[in-house]
Amino acid sequence: MKIVRVALAVPLPRLFDYFVPDDVSLQIGMRVLVPFGTQKRVAIVADFPTKSDVPEDKLKAILQPLDLAPLFTPIYWDWLHWAANYYQAGLGDVLFQALPVKLRNGESAVKNDRTFWRITDAGKNALKQGELKRSKKQAEALQYLSETDLEKGNNDFSSAIWSALKAKGFIEEITIQTNPLSWQQRLGNNPIVNAENRLTLNKQQALAFSQLLFHSGFNVWLLDGVTGSGKTEIYLQYIEEILKSGKQVLVLVPEIGLTPQTVQRFKVRFNVEIDVLHSNLTDTQRLYVWDRARSGQSAIVIGTRSALFTQFSNLGAIILDEEHDSSYKQQDSWRYHARDLAIVLAQKLNISVLMGSATPSLESINNVQNGKYQHLVLSKRAGNSTALRHFVIDLKNQNIQNGLSKPLLERMKAHLEKGNQVLLFLNRRGFAPVLLCHECGWIAQCPHCEKPYTYHQHQNVLRCHHCGAQKTIPRQCGDCGSTHLVTTGLGTEQLEETLKTLFPHYSVARIDRDSTSRKGKLEGYLEDIQQGKSQILIGTQMLAKGHHFPNVTLVALVNVDSALFSLDFRAEERLAQLYIQVAGRAGRADKQGEVVLQTHYPDHPLLTTLLANGYQAFAKETLQLRHSMGLPPFTFQALIKAQARHSDLAENCLSQIADFFQSKQITGLQMLGPMPAPFSKKAGQYRWQLLLQHPSRMTLQKALREYQQAELEKNSQVRLILDVDPQDLS
């Protein structure tokens, strides 16, 4: 009896055995349909063991193979196994993550033909006669078809619209047999680039570019360039060289950095096949791009984090923009980091990774210092951008209106009256709220740890996340006796309403995840900003990077204090990165730019170092501090989270896990917790966490593997999450 071991997308970190009928031929990496309980499930062939732990008479047969050949090349298969091992994830979770949804659901991976919608003569007449005046969306779809055929399922119109038009006889389906051409065949004798759009590199850019070309094979390059220094031009010219060698390129950008203007810049420069992968695509569109990259039809794929799992027939380089950005870390399912996984993939493919940032992560700076990464520096702004002026406003004793001080309002008024735009930036992500005195700046601190208490709104208590101590909310300041105690944090909607009242003659645009959740909203806002229709811009992370706003001359960071006293040791690094990135939005043309920072703590070491000496000086000091405190990147961490409807269930579950690690007596292993998460209740679930830390990555991995294999008592009411190399401790 031939046995096959398969991976399934189920919440169980194990593989499952079936037997293979004699007339069926399988290979590792192919999909099969199997019985699983009372259901039929898609599975992926992972191994052919000689025997099974399941008795032969209990083994079920696979139902049918779904592929003629493996869906994964040997290198990608090896890479995905590495990812599953490192991130302590189920192989099924990882393999299925690497496939488009349509393939996860069992649809065919072979695309021999494509189906299109085409307008009929009746449809053309209907357009002329205006028969669809009452059906605006149908009229739009028909108008679109009058200009070009549209692939079925691979467009922006719903299936209901097409069904209605087909029922009326206005459109028809046509099927075209395809023999896909590679991107080089489609290019023919045309040039790869439009040379008139290629910019002349300055001395620093030319030096960096020549170093890139001099080295071949696997390398990790950190392009460390100040905002506006021309990193994108180096990307484009490097991509041109890769394409000239006949290879493909993957360009990764943060979720919020993938805008139409980013894609347009590539399409204006290159005459090759460019595909885009992002969260707004349909499942059909995602499968289409996956197939094109795998068959060599795509020359360039630009995408967000998950685009990393796109297989290429001949990948030549990976570009990773804004390498420091936290959105490269997956925060649900299995928690991989796209930057780190991209480097492992490049190593296995023997190609280079070019990573760029104006504010590199401290991990990457440390890897440069250790000789693991090559360092390319662009310290000068390209073009005619003028130097910025920086100002700090001390909020103590200021009259504040919803987070806005009088000096800031006066500066805003001055810039707006000159016809310029103003950007106010808020960031609350991952920053735990702390209690402070508005009069003198006193912070409520734990007397045992000398660290700020975290304010827990649901329980209305202060809790120390270093030792677990808690206390009731004080009525007055511990230093000056003032009763004016405030928590850090401010909402974009509150700020929007305040600004509309204070500046009634100017248009206010609020750009955050809520206001841009609908398709096309972000693009509309960005166009309004470019055209000057909005004068006051309120932004979150979305506006911090990548956008060119030539008329923005004043940028203000409204609330930074929570980052200065966060229990997350990375909060200060993120604040420094945000400050530099946000400042890069001001004065990008020939206009003088100003950056204003509001804080109760103008003398905080982070702010004084950052403003006086820049990001590199801050990074150097912070790395020294991390080293002395035994924090990453000099140690390695894993976070185990427990969520349950009852707090004691989550706490007890983590206590059992902590006891397990304690029993192993692992030298050098530090544990913090179990303790409530900084945001201890979310969506009706109580959240607890246990942080593990060790100076050896290998030792920590071994301990985690033993924990995964241990027969610990499970509680179905508790959801456990393991996050290796956590980026967010909240």
Swiss-Prot record:
InterPro entries: DEAD/DEAH_box_helicase_dom, Helicase_ATP-bd, Helicase_C-like, P-loop_NTPase, PriA, PriA_3primeBD, PriA_3primeBD_sf, PriA_C. Binds 2 zinc ions per subunit. ATP binds at residues 225-232. It catalyses: Couples ATP hydrolysis with the unwinding of duplex DNA by translocating in the 3'-5' direction; ATP + H2O = ADP + phosphate + H(+). One of its GO terms (cellular component) is primosome complex. The keyword DNA-binding applies. Zn(2+) 1 binds at residues 437, 440, 477, 480. This is Replication restart protein PriA. It comes from Haemophilus influenzae (strain ATCC 51907 / DSM 11121 / KW20 / Rd).
